[in-house]
Amino acid sequence: MKKKKVITFIAIIILLLILFLYRSTSFIIDFQWFQELSYTSVFLKEFFTIGKLFTLSFALIFISIWLYYLSLKKNINWQEHNKRKKLMIAFNCIVSSLFAYFFSSKYWYQILQFNNSVPFDIKDPIFNKDISFYIFKLPFLQSIYVLILRVLVFLVIYTLILYFIINLKDKIKEINFRKTLNIKSIKNDVKDFAGKQLAVVSAIILLFLSMGYIIKSRNLVYSPRGLIFGASYTDINISLLIYRIIIIVSFIGSIVVFISIINKKIKPIIISLVLIFLLILSEGATSKLVQTFVVNSNEKKLEEPFVRYNIDYTRKAFDIDDIEEINFDINNNLTAQDIKNNKESIDNIRINSFEPALEFYNQYQTIRPYYIFNDIDIDRYKINGKESQIFISARELNLKAIEPNTWQNRHLIYTHGYGVAMSKVNSVTEEGQPDFSIKDIPQVNNTDILIDNPRIYFGEKTDEYAIINTKLKEFDYPQGANNKITEYDGKSGIKMNLLNKIIFAINKKDLNFLLSRDVTRESRILINRNIVERAKKIAPFLTYDNDPHLVIHDNKLYWVIDAYTTSNKYPYSQPYEDINYIRNSAKVIIDAIDGDINFYITNKNDPIIVSYSKIFKNLFKDYSKIPEGIKEHLKYPEDIFKIQCKVFEKYHMTDTIAFLNGDDLWELSQDEKTMNTDKATNESPYVFMKLPNDNLEEMILLGYFNMKQRNTMSSMLAARMTSDNYGKLIMYRFPIHKTIYSPYFFKQKIKQDPLISKELSLWNIGEGGAKVQFGDTIILPINNSLLYVESMYLRAKGKNSAPEVKGIILSYGDKIVLDTTMDEALTKLFTKKEEGKEENIEDNKINSIKEAKVIYDKAIKAQRDGDWAKYGEYIKKLGNILEYMVK
């Protein structure tokens, strides 16, 4: 019998250990992973903070409930109910644990922010409090208020439950004897049992109600009631006034309730509660009446100061309050010499577009079906001594395409992508395809940019774990009929010892970790390999850019992710996409082989990122620590620029009257990607150019604005990204009395030009044939003029065809030209026609007709043969002849 008990005890212990291990696997794995990356303190910050808060809050809640229970003890027959003491202690432990766990796990981060708040040095216009109060402190105070209110309500319910449990036996006897339930008797018994306690709790509840309205009054700065976001005329003059009355009445009411319960008087309690209830109801009704009958008919006058607050604080919150504004008068007086003076800008004009280039990369540079290019990034590199804009993309593994898709293939053999594809943005091949500088597998590199190890273990598509240093060699890249193999030479990974095999088998619910003979003690597992998820795992409080970009530095591959601090608690700031404050305050840099990840602060003027750095002391590094070779490739990100542009559509207006009237509303310019398609928002282009009145070329991010519901451009916003001017925004305002073509309007101009439209019609053969596509529209400011650039793509028939650049359209002033290359188009655009001798027009026309017939026949033959390069060449010649004939 004793032996059976021992066996049973051991079995229970083993079962509990397995259950504990199962629950603990995620924690153990995460701890090892953070330890590997030297971020143990970041990981343990949450754990220890929750632990401290749980212990403290558990003790406070347990003691409060127990003292409350002991205060009821005087009215309990303790000898009769002494056996319930252990039950009450257990019940108190459970309740206190639940409250403590809820509080510590949900609000640990708010408490850290509260304790590590950093002033904004900007005060709100209503309560004169620093913005940091609203960002860091008010949310926590609100959470504490809700928690305490719940505990107080629980105490009332707890009292009633305790009363009925203790007196249940007597009450059942009474009901059986009298056949009725004496409500008055119960009421008096409750008063005798816990009258004083309920008086105190009820009074505290009312006291906290007054505190709740103090918090609610502060939240008026987020009111959506008026014309704008933030406290309006009605909020300040009516709602705030009534809130203050409720605060005073609730405070007085708490005293009245306490005294009345002690004296067993119900009437004063009812009067107090009814008065508070009526005040709460009156706030909504009174505010609505004032808004309808007073404010709406005098809106502009009454709301003007509050609109002023909204304009000022929205511009501050989205960092558009310090934009340099320049009046850009369009003179259209460029000469060929001006073009020569801006040669570097002209040479770097992008004639390749993102989507067609990515499509071409995936068709011709993946090499095998199991490779994929996720997206294309634009960057600038000094190539062979010359500053150049390029497209670059990582060749990553597409694990879904691996055949056979076995566990070994997915996790042990196919572990990494290989290399990059890089092409020039300013040129194409004779066929109109991207002009590659780095391509193929193994890498063919025509630049002086070296990549010693092109393997990509950490990327945008590396969503699964990989086990390296196994008995199986890793697939490196295809080489003819055979495959090149390799072995991981990085330093990352968690050792796969027996304990870790068990932990991962439990965590991943996969016995292969234990059964595979290929995984040895020397093997390591790489987890959290998706670079964005990797960053989120370490710093989930940051918001990450949708488009990480790849950088070649020191002969290695690195990923750069832009990280943002955001909030929806900035007073008076108009929300956009659920936020009303944003800063690009950090850059995350990840090694593509080792997975080493570093967070760098790039904006020390952002109080939120400074607060984060105080909370997580070992997480962030200073901007100066970023390697110089990577600094050269930092870009102002599109995500924040798009948000700023969206806000700027309305908030470029700083005059309240103009703002209220909507006199000068803008919208981001629309564009058209294919012939006769719907409009879509124009993508903001990165361009390498010299800003007007500046001496040096640099990478700029441009946004084009139209007048609202019109296709004429009103302005252009430029974001700079050199180290000295990083993030500086410049707005070029165009004259309102001139018609400035927007990207969409420019497309219509192209289609309305008789010569170009004829040629495009010949290209656009029709259903079942080739299709014409527009590229990205680039509008380049040069001196006091605008040069429009548009690439024309031709897509051949067939699902595997990729669009190819077949023409460049340039426009300046009223002139528009189409040619096969940028140089030819520029020559045609800026070279004046020389006066020639008179010719026999009739003879020339006859000869031209004959020549046109010959070229037309050749073009049709090339079309049938699928030789689109020759077809384009013949069509161009035919167009030139037709152009000559109509002169």
Swiss-Prot record:
Listed under GO cellular component are: extracellular region; plasma membrane
Protein known as: UPF0182 protein CTC_00086
Which Cys pairs are S-S linked? none
The UniProt similarity line reads: Belongs to the UPF0182 family.
Q: Which UniProt keywords apply?
A: Cell membrane, Membrane, Transmembrane, Transmembrane helix
Q: What stretches pass through the bilayer?
A: 9-29, 47-67, 87-107, 146-166, 195-215, 242-262, 266-286
Primary localization: membrane
Cleaved signal peptide residues: none
Cellular localisation: Cell membrane
